[in-house]
Amino acid sequence: MKPVIALVGRPNVGKSTLFNRLTRSRDALVADLPGLTRDRHYGEGRVGERPYLVVDTGGFEPVAKDGILHEMARQTRQAVEEADVVVFIVDGRNGLAPQDKSIADYLRKTGRPIFLVVNKAEGMKYTAVATDFYELGLGDPRAISAAHGDGVTDMINEALEVAYAGQPEEAEEDDPSRGIKIAIVGRPNVGKSTLVNALIGEDRVIAFDMPGTTRDSIYVDFERNGKKYTLIDTAGLRRRGKVFEAIEKFSVVKTLQSISDANVVILLLDAQQDISDQDAHIAGFVVEQGRALVIGVNKWDGFDDHARDRAKADLTRKLKFLDFAKSHFISAAKKTGIGALMRSVDDAYAAAMSKLPTPKLTRALIEAVEFQQPRRRGPVRPKLRYAHQGGQNPPIIVIHGNALDAVTETYKRYLENRFRETFSLTGTPLRIEFRSSNNPYADKG
């Protein structure tokens, strides 16, 4: 599982600036659950080969009793509970504030590793910046400038050393005797627990828990029709006797972790509710992570033809970017449609792990170009010469040629569709990379 780093501090100390620098993006996944008055932002960062999730919390007022500040404090506490490391940010220009002391008092009691970070320290001597903050009793302050990047790399490297040291051994997760790793994700109350119980109970398979992180990640191994599968961190489901039930707290962090760890993701939607921005955000993270995907539309039973047509149209319109994934209309409660859903899981996994021979890829590329050439950009027309596979899960196709920076997104999409059709790559994202020759004359004509 990717470790989680939570950014905590009072308002306006630079948490969002640091978040944007760590994730190298201004785009963030947002938890827009009903009733939340201030969203937490989630993103992914990476240092070398070490990925991590980072949470940008709202301004923290631990003693707030009601209203928006109370709600923001509640959400921050949840983020701290889910974090492997907490980065506590204070303002070096404005100095120590009473709220900083209240936050420090709370954080000391959590038992989480705390990194005290003094932001906005550019142009200031370390001793002048840090002295006041020793009073918080959280060890040596680390001076940074989130806006300029000063000190950020060293700080995050130290934080990741601690975060990864606390991660469980992954030998169990990577055991080759295990089957396809599946994450079932979706909003609260879409029927995840019902689907899990339908899957593990249908063949009278004994399911068992395998402890993961200290925050109760679950691994459930089961067989179906002679095939092995593993449900990984069922994200909001906990064992109650012989069945799984939804718990009261929906965790976006656990959802993102389970997506990252999966081979195939089942995105479960509720046919009786409109597709929300949150559904689209979760789906977008699946694609960003390159995970194979199957869509399950639950609670389908009882719909008349008109309602079904409307639900299908809503799915096509709002999740158009998932057109590579198969959709299944199911009833987890009545166990209808689940067989076809699982067959698509198998197909999506097979597609994600496909081996694409260079001669066949190049032949498919040439046929695609002969059928429709890329457009010129000024005097230059891109020349696509040959292709080979650059990776699996998701499949990566590397195309070599000349002037390939002139290839449009529309033409790239055309090539993707041609490759999907030729190699039956349904259910998996597909990456296409272009590598141009340095010959400035080879692309003329």
Swiss-Prot record:
The keyword Amino-acid biosynthesis does not apply. It holds the Pfam family MMR_HSR1. Residues 3-167, 180-353 form the EngA-type G domain. GTP 2 binds at residues 186-193, 233-237, 298-301. GO terms for molecular function: ATP hydrolysis activity; GTP binding; ribosome binding. Coiled coil: none annotated. It comes from the Bacteria. GTPase that plays an essential role in the late steps of ribosome biogenesis. Associates with the 50S ribosomal subunit. Belongs to the TRAFAC class TrmE-Era-EngA-EngB-Septin-like GTPase superfamily. EngA (Der) GTPase family. This is GTPase Der. It comes from Burkholderia cenocepacia (strain ATCC BAA-245 / DSM 16553 / LMG 16656 / NCTC 13227 / J2315 / CF5610) (Burkholderia cepacia (strain J2315)).
